[in-house]
Amino acid sequence: MESQSILPPPPPPEDASAPPPPPEESAAPPPPPDVSAPPPPPEDLPPPPPEPEVKKKKVGWGTKRPATTPLSVEELVRKKREADAAAARPKFMSKAERERLALEKRAKEVDAQRRRTNGTPNGVDGMDLDTPSRGFRTPNGDSRSIPTGPRAMRNGDGPTPTGPAAMRSRNDSGTTKSDKKVDKRFNEEDEAAAQAALIKQRYMGADQTSNFSAKKKRKRTTDRKFNFEWNAEEDTSGDYNPLYQHRHEANFFGRGRLAGFGDDVADSVAKKYAKALEDRDREAGSIRAREILEMERRRREESTRNQLDKHWSEKKLEHMRERDWRIFKEDFNIATKGGSVPNPMRSWDESGLPKRLLELVDRVGYKEPTPIQRAAIPIAMQSRDLIGVAVTGSGKTAAFLLPLLCYIAELPRIDEFEWRKNDGPYAIVLAPTRELAQQIEIEAKKFTEPLGFNVVSIVGGHSFEEQAYSLRNGAEIIIATPGRLVDCIERRMLVLSQCCYVIMDEADRMIDLGFEEPVNKILDALPVTNEKPDTEEAEDSSAMSRHLGSKDRYRQTMMYTATMPTAVERIARKYLRRPAIVTIGSAGEAVDTVEQRVEMIAGEDKRKKRLGEILSSGDFRPPIIVFVNIKRNCDAIAREIKQWGFSSVTLHGSKTQEQREAALASVRNGSTDVLVATDLAGRGIDVPDVSLVINFNMATSIESYTHRIGRTGRAGKSGVAITFLGNEDADVMYDLKQMLIKSPISRVPEELRKHEAAQSKPTRGAGKKIEEASGFAGKGGW
């Protein structure tokens, strides 16, 4: 073994012209030529003399390597061209050689199959005992097996070494360090991609894209399924069986019938059965037949009563069910709270009002009740205390006037005895402004004069002597503002000894104007003998109506408002007993019939120019109302409007009562085109057929804005409200944007939507504006 390891390799064969044998398929391909290795010596030269043995030098990373001479480009191109030409030439192989190669290949396949099937004697699968042992190699490439020959000849199936061992690849396992680096880089990239996918799913949610495709061809699973159903034309039983040709009809006793048939079939069956009874027995059978037909008629009516496909407007009142009432309330946006609240009325005939009062309603022209009238009148007719929350212009005046007239109609006439005149009215109606009080008086006289009742209004701007003269004959109903009514009580012009009906209209506006203390004084002046108990008995309509026709009837209190601030709730808790709460829509919202438009215009001159363009466009017919915030601006804008060729009047707190009434009368009768006013005209003033409301200055609060635009679109008619907005209105921009969003027919302009002040609700009390006018007493007020 020692001698074999030092022998040089055998010399090449002498016959260089003979073709080399074909390479075996199982042999590994030769390695690429090593460009750093020196070329082999030519064959015709004699072998070089043996070189003296030189001691090996230590090779390391710091050792300087000898410079190698690179090959020329022309030499490489020439070699490549020769190799390509040799590969392109066909190689001739004899038949015997081809058969030999085929037999060798087949023998190797059989041998490999035999080794895989039977295994080796030692139990090691896949090892050839005839070949030299390859041994086990560590990751560093070192062999741990027993050497069987020279290092250069251990791997017999490998290529012959062509250079020093230090310049050859030691990794024989097929995986190089560069491959390991590539795999490691790919693993790191896969891990980074997986982490990025998890982060994307965490913050952006799972992928909602569906991979479903309707065009994708699906495998049909019912092709070979046997069909157990037969078509009608495949039935052959009727050809030979007479039973199928003459089918027997099932006859039921009495009203029995097959399911799935309509009432017409049941009616015909009942008539047929009744006729059979009459034919069998003329006397008793005819009576029984009539009873059966009557039973069938009642059954048909009962089924019609419980039908769900009929609308509530097509049903009778006794046929209405809880589901129908729920749909009815949703249609009119009615919400009620409180115990024992009656159902709304669908028409005036179901209101429970006296016949004489219904005739007056028809004469005045109230065809269909409004939502607040549908819900509030049945509750008020049961002597219940009531809080009505409804949008402006919804018919609240008639909602409390009609039950009031029905209430006092049961009481003795006030002019029957002299002492009754001196005990004061039966009912008082409180309103925040003089104009609203006079408007309620006009509406009330439409019903009270035919019934013989006396109505008197007590408001500021008129002398006390004139109002005392109006009260000389007594009055069943007094309509007043809180301030003037307190003055009359303190001057002993009026007492409330027999007052049993109290109505507060626009209660939230009265609180805003500082009338909370006068309202408390008025309510404290009422008698306590007829006050309702604060128990469940206050919800019992029969108990509250027990003393009909006498003086001792329980007091009934009603409050109507558009919003519910804290002060209004405080008054309601103190003076109302177990009230029923009726809400139409949402508190504080504008009516859906008003189209709200907002224009961002800064500066008085630009707003005046835009106002002139709107009035001159001819798109809106008079009357038109223009609202401003400051009283001195009313006259200036009115002069501008007159210069444009339109007639105009002003309405504000510096006007006398006669001037206010004359201005409203000129607008109502059509002699004036434009009314320029402050918030004095923004609450409760009813000017018919107002087509346009212009807010020259935005209101200081969203509640005032709501009642300003409520002057148009009243009684179900449509209207338009245009508001000029500036940066000084930042406190109300957020609420204004929310109101425009809720309106189905309005649009939020982009300037308002993107404005900084409209993004969040302002803090309470920050930048709150103070209204200039502060009351209604004399010229100093509105």
UniProtKB/Swiss-Prot annotation:
GO terms for biological process: mRNA splicing, via spliceosome. PROSITE patterns: DEAD_ATP_HELICASE (PS00039), HELICASE_ATP_BIND_1 (PS51192), HELICASE_CTER (PS51194), Q_MOTIF (PS51195). The keyword Nucleotide-binding applies. Residues 377-582 form the Helicase ATP-binding domain. Coiled coil: none annotated. It is found in: Cytoplasm; Nucleus. The keyword Nucleus applies. One of its GO terms (cellular component) is cytoplasm. Keywords: ATP-binding, Cytoplasm, Helicase, Hydrolase, mRNA processing, mRNA splicing, Nucleotide-binding, Nucleus. Residues 75-84, 94-114, 177-187 have a biased composition (Basic and acidic residues). The Q motif is unique to and characteristic of the DEAD box family of RNA helicases and controls ATP binding and hydrolysis. Component of the U5 snRNP complex. Belongs to the DEAD box helicase family. DDX23/PRP28 subfamily. This is Pre-mRNA-splicing ATP-dependent RNA helicase prp28. The gene is prp28.
